[in-house]
């Protein structure tokens, strides 16, 4: 059923980048076309006291998140030691709107762990605090003084009874992941004993501040000891299952666990094995590997090989079904990276049968068995080939592309070596058939999936201090990349600074209500003038599920609803979808969860 009603009241806002890799499935899909990589619009430091070791920064900078009204919220390291604050900046020009300190202390580490924020549907941003707690604030787009509210997964009263003891003991150790109802999931390390006897744990806090947790030992059925540092929890498309990696006190043994989001009870535990040797795979606390959940409910997760180095330090990208059974050949590179999802329709170079492909870092490190020919790759999860280095059966390479900048530091033994790809997530833009990623050479690239070329390159820095970092896109199509401890906002050279407040010339897509929904959800869109628009429902792979409208509409607001059915009027599967509005030159989208 599609219901149309024209009224004349203001519309609502645009799409957002909500957490690590964009969403709770970590697919890194942009919901709007990205701007051309032509100019730096603004920049701001994400580390006020970067600690260089030579020209290297041993830190994983956390991902910015971006609200629907285009406010960019980012974690900022403020001291030489591990001290942080959160800043909110206007996406159009980088103007500082507000900032808040956090008393967060990361767990013991080699590389400084990422400080991972998440947006929640009730207009909040959550960020880690001391003692395993979360801090949140709202009014995110308002330039005013903000205060933080604390939420302890073990109860605020318990925390208040002895904050010093909990601060000394408990450390949030992963980026935060929020579901569509505002519950936030994360991992916790207990570095010393605490008054409640809480051990290493997987925790959740709902929007009312009520928490729950399960020990890693219980979650893994007695097999693991701690959550892997930097592993952002991933949610199934229906948000009924949480996936997270755990490990022993050292990097082995490693496990992937699936928990019920309702009570954190264990559904499945999968020991992670090196596909070549059969030994337990390495799960490193110095990496950033995070599960990615695909539209067919497969789970992809990257590990290091065991023994270390036998696969040229590339690791493996493992794939599992929803119950964590092995479900296909591994990718030949996996560790320190969250794979991105590329809809097959967004990759004209592809002619196979899979509905999606896997975009991955594909480095081949010099001096570790590789030749330094560092690439990024596009893999087919349904088809296999023999890897030229290991001789193992791996996911088929649909396309790969070599980094553009020679690496003389690799030495004369590696004349074809190039600078490596320093990314822990990329951005996939299905509208322009491209992937956006940064490299160690200080440049931001657009990889054109129609021509298998770098169609755009923008120099951000001379290539100094390139820590492993995320790439992010905003609701206006602006692209964000971190290079040399600085966040760069990148886009078209002819884009001027926008005034504060809504752009009256823009398309606007209202909030979907209810969300999640079981029968139907209602929403509005607003047009600044008469124009031809298309309104579609798409799935997380970018495939069209249903066209709700395709025609010319008058200026003003138009109300519609979606009943959860596809174009053939069949009931859609439970999961996350996007309602997308486009007029041919601009696009806005809203996320919705269907739970029939």
What residues fall within each predicted segment?
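Surface-exposed coil/turn segments at beta-strand junctions on protein surfaces, enriched
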Residues: 516-518, 528, 553-555, 567, ...
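N-terminal signal peptide c-region/cleavage motif recognized by signal peptidases
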Residues: 8-10
């Amino acid at each position: 059923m599609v219901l149309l009603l024209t009224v004349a009241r203001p519309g609502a806002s645009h799409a957002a980048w909500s957490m690590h890799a964009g969403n709770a499935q970590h697919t890194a899909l942009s919901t709007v076309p990205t701007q051309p990589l032509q100019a730096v619009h603004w920049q701001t430091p994400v580390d006020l006291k970067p600690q260089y070791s030579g020209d290297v920064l041993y830190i994983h900078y956390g991902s910015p998140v971006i609200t629907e009204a285009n406010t960019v919220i980012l974690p900022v390291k403020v001291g030489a030691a591990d001290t942080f604050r959160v800043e909110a900046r206007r996406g159009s020009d980088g103007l500082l709107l507000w900032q808040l300190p956090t008393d967060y202390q990361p767990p013991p580490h080699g590389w400084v762990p990422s400080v991972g924020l998440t947006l929640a549907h009730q207009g909040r941003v959550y960020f880690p605090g001391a003692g395993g707690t979360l801090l949140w604030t709202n009014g995110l787009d308002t330039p005013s003084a903000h205060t933080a509210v604390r939420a302890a997964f073990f109860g605020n009263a318990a925390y208040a009874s002895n904050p010093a003891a909990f601060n000394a003991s408990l450390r949030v150790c992963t980026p935060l992941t929020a579901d569509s109802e505002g519950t936030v999931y994360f991992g916790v390390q207990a570095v010393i004993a605490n008054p409640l006897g809480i051990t290493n744990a997987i925790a959740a806090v709902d929007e009312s501040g009520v928490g729950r947790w399960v020990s890693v030992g219980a979650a893994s059925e007695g097999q693991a000891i701690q959550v892997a540092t930097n592993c952002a929890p991933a949610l199934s498309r229906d948000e009924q299952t949480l996936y997270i990696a755990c490990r022993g006190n050292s990097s082995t043994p490693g496990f992937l666990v699936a928990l019920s989001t309702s009570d954190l009870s264990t559904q499945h535990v999968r020991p992670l094995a090196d596909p070549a040797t059969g030994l337990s795979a390495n799960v490193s606390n110095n990496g950033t590997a995070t599960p990615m959940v695909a539209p067919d409910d497969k789970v992809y997760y990257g590990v290091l090989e065991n023994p270390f180095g036998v696969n040229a330090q590339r690791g493996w990208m493992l794939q599992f079904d929803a119950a964590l059974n092995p479900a296909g050949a591994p990718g030949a590179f996996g560790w320190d990276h969250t794979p991105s999802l590329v809809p097959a329709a967004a990759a004209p170079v592809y002619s196979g049968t899979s509905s999606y492909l896997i975009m991955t870092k594909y480095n081949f490190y010099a001096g570790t068995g590789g030749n330094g020919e560092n690439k990024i790759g596009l893999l087919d999860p349904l088809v296999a080939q023999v890897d030229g280095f290991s001789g193992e059966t791996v996911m088929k390479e649909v396309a790969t592309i070599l980094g553009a900048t020679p690496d003389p530091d690799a030495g004369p033994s590696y004349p074809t070596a190039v600078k490596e790809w320093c990314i822990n997530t990329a951005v996939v833009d299905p509208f322009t058939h491209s992937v956006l990623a940064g490299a160690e050479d200080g440049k931001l690239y657009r990889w054109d999936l129609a021509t298998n070329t770098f169609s755009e390159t923008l120099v951000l820095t001379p290539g100094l201090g390139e820590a492993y970092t995320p790439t992010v896109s905003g609701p206006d199509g602006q692209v964000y990349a971190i290079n040399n401890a600085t966040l760069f906002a990148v886009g078209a050279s002819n884009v001027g600074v926008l005034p504060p407040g809504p752009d009256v010339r823009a398309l606007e897509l209202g909030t979907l209500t209810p969300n999640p929904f079981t029968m139907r959800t209602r929403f509005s869109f607003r047009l600044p003038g008469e124009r031809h628009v298309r309104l579609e429902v798409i799935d997380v792979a970018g495939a069209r599920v249903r066209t709700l409208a395709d025609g010319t509409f008058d200026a003003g607001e138009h109300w519609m609803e979606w009943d959860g059915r596809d174009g053939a009027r069949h009931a859609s599967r439970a999961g996350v979808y996007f309602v997308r509005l486009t007029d041919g030159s601009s696009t806005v989208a809203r996320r919705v969860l269907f739970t029939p």
